Amino acid sequence: MEKIFQNVEIKPFLIDFSNPFIKNAAKRLFQLEEQLPLVPVNVVMDFKGINRAAVHGLSRVLQDEIPNYMLDIKPGGYKIEDSTDLFMTEQFIRNRINFIPIYAKNETLVFALRSLNNSCEVKTIYSRDLIQVAGPKLKYPIFNPTFEIGFLQPGKSLIIEDIYIKRGIGRKHAAFNLAVKTHFSHLDIEQYPTDKKEYMALSGYKQSSMTSDPRHHRLGLCFPAVPLPHINQAVRTYLKNACRVIIGRIQSIQKIYENFEEPQPELVLFSMDEEKTKAIITIKDETHTIGNLLKTYIYEMIPDISFVGYQCVPHKQEMVLTIIHKASQEDLITLLEKSIQNIIQTFQILEKNVDELIA
C-alpha cells in the first residue's frame, strides 16, 4: 500500500472576462477588471487500495471536522441605536457576515461596518464595505468584495463594530466548514448504463456498496475561498492537515488502553467466559467519523470477531466503542493496537502521496 492517492484534478472557478456580458457586469457592479483575489476551487481525487471508511473519514474531516475560521460580531458590536433600518435585524446581519467565505490565519484582525444610505434608492451592502480597524495591515485580502451582506432603505444606516475572526469546526457551526459539496463514489462497482436508469436503484450501482468491498474511490469537494496565487499550496495544506487531524484523533485513543491493566474510567475490560473478552472504550468528544474507521479496520484485522460496534452519545459528547472477541484481554488489546496502527499508516501514506501529487 505505497500509493493510495492516485490522481487529483484541481479546477479554480474563474470569471470569464472573454464574455462581454460578464465583463460589463463585473465592471459595473464591482469595478472588477481582473479575477477576484479568492476563488472557489473544485477538487476531484482518486484513491485506490483503501476501504470506503477511510475515504468517508477524509471527506467528513475536510468538510466539518477540521478547525477553520469565520467572521462574527462580538456582543454589543451591533449598534442598535445607530442602525435605523428595522429590516436589517442583528440576527440576519450576523448570519450573513458569518457565511462570508474567508481565508484567514490571523485572529487579531478586527473589522467594522459603517454604512449610510443617502440616496433615494435601496442600497446593497457588500463585503467590500467592511473596513479593517485593528490588526496588522493585510498584504492580501482575506475575503472577496462581492458577498451580499444586506440592504439599506433610503435614509437608513447600519453600524456594526467589533467584527472579529472566530475559530471553530463545522459540526458546531456550518460557517466553519472548510470544504463544501463533498461527495464520493466507488469506481470498482459496476454501474447501470445511462439508458437503463429507470430500472436501477437510486445509487446507480448494480451491487450495493453495503455488501461489496470497494477499493477504488473518487472524492469530490469544493474549497470556497482559496487565494488565487497559491491554489495548489492551499489545497495541499488542507489535505495534509486533514490527514494529521485523523492521525491525532486516533493516537489519542491509544492513551486510553496503553495501561489497560490499571483501572480507568474510559476503559472497561473483562472476561465474559473462559473464551470471550469484552472491551468497552469511552472516547470523549468523538464522532461517527472515527467510530466508522475503528469498526471497519477492526473487522479487517479480525474477520472472525464476535462483535464490534460503536454508539455516539450526543448529550454526553462521547462515543462508546464495544468489542467482543474470543481472546484474552492482552490479545484483544494487541489486536486493537494493530488495527489502530493500520489506520495511522493509511493516513501517513496518504499525507506523503499528497506531497508527491500536488506540487
From Swiss-Prot:
One of the GO biological process terms: viral transcription
UniProt name for this protein: DNA-directed RNA polymerase RPB3-11 homolog
Function: Component of the DNA-directed RNA polymerase (RNAP) that catalyzes the transcription in the cytoplasm of viral DNA into RNA using the four ribonucleoside triphosphates as substrates.
Chain segments annotated as coiled-coil in the UniProt record: none
Classification of source organism: Viruses, Varidnaviria, Bamfordvirae, Nucleocytoviricota, Pokkesviricetes
Keyword Translocase: no
Known partners and oligomeric status: Part of the viral DNA-directed RNA polymerase that consists of 8 polII-like subunits (RPB1, RPB2, RPB3, RPB5, RPB6, RPB7, RPB9, RPB10), a capping enzyme and a termination factor.
Keyword terms: DNA-directed RNA polymerase, Early protein, Host cytoplasm, Transcription, Viral transcription, Virion
Main location: host cell
